[in-house]
Swiss-Prot record:
One of its GO terms (molecular function) is peroxidase activity. Signal peptide: none annotated. GO terms for biological process: hydrogen peroxide catabolic process. This is Hemoglobin subunit beta-1. Hb1 is a heterotetramer of two alpha-1 chains and two beta-1 chains. One of its GO terms (cellular component) is hemoglobin complex. It comes from Liparis tunicatus (Kelp snailfish). This fish has two hemoglobins: Hb1 (major) and Hb2. Hb1 has low oxygen affinity, it displays a pronounced Bohr effect, which is enhanced by ATP, and a pronounced Root effect. Involved in oxygen transport from gills to the various peripheral tissues. Belongs to the globin family. Keywords: Heme, Iron, Metal-binding, Oxygen transport, Transport. Heme b binds at residues 64, 93.
Length: 147
């Protein structure tokens, strides 16, 4: 079980309360597909992913980015039970979708960049540490089925 300080708990909740899922999710997911093009192989049914402009303008990318944000929101609401919270998604991604678990880290890195750009000066080192700790535990939890 992960130990969360009061600061970490409040910071994680505050970040997710401040950001617009409809902007941050699509931006983070699009960034992941652009920066790490090999991740596109899981999304062949999304249509045109041939260049950055196509990815950014793709409604399927936007929709999945929002889905990712709502998935993370589940974790924010269940900080003390993240492994259990993501158990079903871990099974889905490993056994049905066969997603490389390293991709969870890639999207979390892209999300950190997008959140930092949205929060600006409020994204201090301490805030980043809390967010990245949360995302690291989510990544671990999503990859649990692979172990």
């Amino acid at each position: 079980m992960v130990h969360w300080t009061d600061f970490e708990r409040s910071t994680i909740k505050d970040i997710f309360a401040k950001i617009d899922y409809d902007c941050v999710g699509p931006a983070a997911f699009a960034r992941c597909l652009i920066v790490y093009p090999w991740t596109q192989r899981y999304f062949g049914n999304f249509g045109n992913l041939f260049n950055a402009a196509a990815i950014i303008g793709n409604p399927n990318v936007a929709k999945h980015g929002i889905t990712i944000m709502h998935g993370l929101e589940r974790g924010v609401k269940n900080l003390d039970h993240l492994t259990e919270t993501y158990e079903e998604l871990s099974v889905l991604h490993s056994e049905k979708l066969h997603v490389d678990p390293d991709n969870f880290k890639l999207i979390s890195d892209c999300l950190t960049i997008v959140v930092a750009s949205r929060l600006g000066k409020a994204f201090t080192g301490e805030v980043q540490a809390a967010l990245q700790k949360f995302l690291a535990v989510v990544v671990f939890s999503l990859g649990k089925q692979y172990h």
